[in-house]
Structures are given as structure tokens and as C-alpha cells.
Amino acid sequence: MSYPADDYESEAAYDPYAYPGDYDMHTGDPKQDLAYERQYEQQTYQVIPEVIKNFIQYFHKTVSDLIDQKVYELQASRVSSDVIDQKVYEIQDIYENSWTKLTERFFKNTPWPEAETIAPQVGNDAVFLILYKELYYRHIYAKVSGGPSLEQRFESYYNYCNLFNYILNADGPAPLELPNQWLWDIIDEFIYQFQSFSQYRCKTAKKSEEEIDFLRSNPKIWNVHSVLNVLHSLVDKSNINRQLEVYTSGGDPESVAGEYGRHSLYKMLGYFSLVGLLRLHSLLGDYYQAIKVLENIELNKKSMYSRVPECQVTTYYYVGFAYLMMRRYQDAIRVFANILLYIQRTKSMFQRTTYKYEMINKQNEQMHALLAIALTMYPMRIDESIHLQLREKYGDKMLRMQKGDPQVYEELFSYSCPKFLSPVVPNYDNVHPNYHKEPFLQQLKVFSDEVQQQAQLSTIRSFLKLYTTMPVAKLAGFLDLTEQEFRIQLLVFKHKMKNLVWTSGISALDGEFQSASEVDFYIDKDMIHIADTKVARRYGDFFIRQIHKFEELNRTLKKMGQRP
């Protein structure tokens, strides 16, 4: 394959007279560096710059050395060593820093050199080229103007097949280790590209007959069954569920890991695949199954596996959303509040890496919107700092939702929900223009129906708080309802305020029926008796925190005043 003519500029720009440099591109002379970059942007012939060649050769050597060391250790029946750990650390630095910097400088909106072009530089190393293509296609999806072509979508799928076949179909453990961040990104991107293709194939209006025929004749490419098969195979190969079961009970997971699960590559891919299955089932609208795949992961306990922040944030986002759609509002609020507090306290750590910050910041905003919805439908106390953030962001919208404005509910849901998809290949002979929106519209209808059922509850709650006893007929009159309609709404109130709530145990599906409503009532003949069940707010903790903040501010001001 060759670049389209207008993409030659992506590789352009090698000045044969400039300082060749090593893979980090610095000469030490700012003027020379700037001139080099300008020449790089202006020239348009197909030559791989020396700086990129050096980087790719260094990248290949690091991966190749790691594989050689891993082969040696597998032959010696050793799981890992300090040498392997050091090589993984070097690859992590290349992956998170060097690759990102080079991309930003030379391939910001254009593709990297194709694998076929760089193959001679790396001795046609098949494993390295698979890893390189994983990064190459991911960059096209994320940054290249116009996104991937149909051909590139297919090629990326085949490359993932090659990668997973290498890992899963070897006679023994594959001689490879990769940083946890990269392993998570592989699973995350694999599902994202499946999601992207599922939506792409439904939009046929601007596609040529040739493209539609190509899609029609290849129904198994990015098929939901193949994606599920990969994720389940990685889970089974790693024996991760059994490892987690033993780990949460206080045992040694290594004792049940098996031949493959002892190795970090398989263990972490297995764990990340569980989160991938959570995400995939959520995108398909199967919320019970989404949470069930995590039955051996204890969300409320810090795990040895939660080393990748994006994985942790993604897990909580999809678990919280699944709880919301299952009408387990109290659990959804707890999950969202916990992860938002975690993000709030560790935000500075993410800001060091732009691409991580963008992803986490987006899900942070979405979870604030989902929390606003959940708290409107099921009012309860949350952490003070999260509550303040929520009031700043969505105070007005929450007031409108409390008044029963369905438009605000729909707006926040549309903004914060996942991009739902249909697992079914469309009928290409009869695809209407909005076919790709049908999965979303179906989930929106389910959500809107639930909102509609609760439309009167906020008003009823506010009236109930005003009285301790009241004739049913009189209170019905205040609400412009007949006595029968009001009794139905009271029954709805009782039903909707009773939630299945997780209390203990590992499985997130476990729980007991509870009510955290601030008011409760019972009806005796024609009288309604109301009790305020609100727990008194502990103001002491709030004032202590404010005093500590004031003292810290006072100390800072004194230090500033002492400066000459």
C-alpha cells in the first residue's frame, strides 16, 4: 500500500544537511531546531527522516532485546526478572514519551510511515511490525484528518487478529511483555475500533456502491462474536477470574494462575479484558451481564491490578452507568462519588500526560452529569466537595429536573451516555438515514420512560416534608390530583425509593433492598402519617475542615509577608 498523494507531506521534511540527531530530535541549538522543523514541514518527497529511522531502530532493538531475554527465561522456567522489568520500563518510556513527542512534532495530523516502508529498517521482524501497526492505526483513528478509510479499518482488524493469535495460539506463553499502560490501550482501542466500525457501516448515505458491496461481502470483519471471543479467550487463558477469587479471599493468586496466568502479559490482558467486557455489554445495553463479568472484582477495595488510572476511571464510569439504568440509584451515586473524589485528588498527576488528561477529563464531566441525574431521581447525601462541584456545574439544570423538565434529562443523558451500538449487520439494501442512531434512541426511550414514571415524585416529596399528618384527599387536592391518582403516586413513591443496594460481598450485583429517602409515610384509613428520616448533618466535620484550610492559608500569607 502507498500513501495518497496528499499524505506525502506527513513524511516530508527531511533536510539532508541538517543535524541528523538521535531519536529525541534535539541539536541543542533552538534556531537550528526551528529551521529543521520548518524544512520538514515544507518538503514533500517520500523519504523517512533520519531521526525517525533512528527512533524506530532503537524501538525495535528494545523490543527485540526484551523478547530474546524472555525466550531465555521461559527456557529456564523463570517467570520474570530485573532485566525484563528494566526492558519493560524502557519500552514504557518510548511508548509514553518518545512516541508521543515525535508524533506531536512530525505526524500531528498525518500518518506515521507505513509498516511496509519501515520493515527493512527492522529486519522484517513480524512481531515488532504487528506492534508498530497497532500504534500506526490507532494514530490514524485519533489524529489523521478524515479518519481511517474502509481499507484501513479492515487492515487494523486483521492486525489485531495477528496480535491476539500470536498471544493466544502459541504452544506456550508468548515471549513478550509490555507496559500495563500499553496493554490497557490495546484492549481499549480494540473495543473503540469495533464501536467505530459498527457505527460506520450503518451510515451508507455517502458510501459508493463499491464500498457497500465490500461491506456486504465481509460480514465477519469486526463482527461482535469475534470481538467477544477475543476478550473471553484472554480471560480464560489468564485464569484471571480464579486469580481474583483467590486474591480477594486473602490467598496467593500465583498458586492458581497456571502456565499462562503467571506471566504479566496474560494476567493484565485478562484483567483488562474483563473491563472490556463490562464496556462492550454496556454498549449493547445488557447492563446485568456488564456488571456480572466483574463478579470477582471488589470495586470498593484497592486492588493490585488497578495500576492504570484510565482503566479505573472507565470501570467506574460503566459500572455507575449500568447501575443507573438498572434503577440502582444509591449504588450509582456511591460509585460516581467515589471515582470523582479520586479524580479530584489525583488530577495533577494526569495533567502531565495530555492524552490521558483529555480522556479522563471527558469522563469526569460525563460522570458529573450522570451523578446530577441520579441525585435528582434519588436525593441523598454525598461528599461535600463533590456536592459543591455539582452545584457549580449543574445547579440550574438540577432545579429544572426537580421540576420535571424532560428536556434537561434528555440533554444530560445524551451528553453523558456511552455511544450505544447494534451488534447486527444492517440490511444494506434498505438502511434509513438514522439507522445508526437507533441503539441510542432505544436506550433514551427506556430512560425517558423511567423519568416519566417519576415525574410527580419530586413535588410529592416536597409536600410530604411540610406535614406530619394530613388527610389523603386534602393533600391530593394540593397536587390537583384525584384521591385515587394520588394513592397511585404514593405507591409509585414507595416503589421507586426502594432500591437494591450493595452492602457487602465481592459481586457488584449483590445487595439488599433499602430506602435512603429523607421522608417515609404510611396510610391509616384516610390519613397519611409522615416521618422525617433525614439524618442530621454533622456540621462539626465541615467546620474542622474549614478551620484547617483557614490556618493553612494564614501560614501561607505570613510566609509571603516575611519575604524581602
From Swiss-Prot:
<comment type="subunit">
    <text>Component of the eukaryotic translation initiation factor 3 (eIF-3) complex, which is composed of 13 subunits: EIF3A, EIF3B, EIF3C, EIF3D, EIF3E, EIF3F, EIF3G, EIF3H, EIF3I, EIF3J, EIF3K, EIF3L and EIF3M. The eIF-3 complex appears to include 3 stable modules: module A is composed of EIF3A, EIF3B, EIF3G and EIF3I; module B is composed of EIF3F, EIF3H, and EIF3M; and module C is composed of EIF3C, EIF3D, EIF3E, EIF3K and EIF3L. EIF3C of module C binds EIF3B of module A and EIF3H of module B, thereby linking the three modules. EIF3J is a labile subunit that binds to the eIF-3 complex via EIF3B.</text>
</comment>
<dbReference type="Pfam" id="PF10255">
    <property type="entry name" value="Paf67"/>
</dbReference>
<dbReference type="GO" id="GO:0001732">
    <property type="term" value="P:formation of cytoplasmic translation initiation complex"/>
</dbReference>
<feature type="modified residue" description="N6-acetyllysine">
    <location>
        <position position="465"/>
    </location>
</feature>
<keyword id="KW-0007">Acetylation</keyword>
<comment type="similarity">
    <text>Belongs to the eIF-3 subunit L family.</text>
</comment>
<comment type="function">
    <text>Component of the eukaryotic translation initiation factor 3 (eIF-3) complex, which is required for several steps in the initiation of protein synthesis. The eIF-3 complex associates with the 40S ribosome and facilitates the recruitment of eIF-1, eIF-1A, eIF-2:GTP:methionyl-tRNAi and eIF-5 to form the 43S pre-initiation complex (43S PIC). The eIF-3 complex stimulates mRNA recruitment to the 43S PIC and scanning of the mRNA for AUG recognition.</text>
</comment>
<dbReference type="GO" id="GO:0006413">
    <property type="term" value="P:translational initiation"/>
</dbReference>
<dbReference type="GO" id="GO:0003743">
    <property type="term" value="F:translation initiation factor activity"/>
</dbReference>
<feature type="modified residue" description="N-acetylserine">
    <location>
        <position position="2"/>
    </location>
</feature>
<dbReference type="GO" id="GO:0033290">
    <property type="term" value="C:eukaryotic 48S preinitiation complex"/>
</dbReference>
<keyword id="KW-0648">Protein biosynthesis</keyword>
<dbReference type="InterPro" id="IPR019382">
    <property type="entry name" value="eIF3l"/>
</dbReference>
<feature type="modified residue" description="N6-acetyllysine">
    <location>
        <position position="549"/>
    </location>
</feature>
<dbReference type="InterPro" id="IPR000717">
    <property type="entry name" value="PCI_dom"/>
</dbReference>
<dbReference type="GO" id="GO:0016282">
    <property type="term" value="C:eukaryotic 43S preinitiation complex"/>
</dbReference>
<keyword id="KW-0963">Cytoplasm</keyword>
<keyword id="KW-0396">Initiation factor</keyword>
<feature type="domain" description="PCI">
    <location>
        <begin position="331"/>
        <end position="537"/>
    </location>
</feature>
<dbReference type="InterPro" id="IPR011990">
    <property type="entry name" value="TPR-like_helical_dom_sf"/>
</dbReference>
<protein>
    <recommendedName>
        <fullName>Eukaryotic translation initiation factor 3 subunit L</fullName>
    </recommendedName>
</protein>
<dbReference type="GO" id="GO:0005852">
    <property type="term" value="C:eukaryotic translation initiation factor 3 complex"/>
</dbReference>
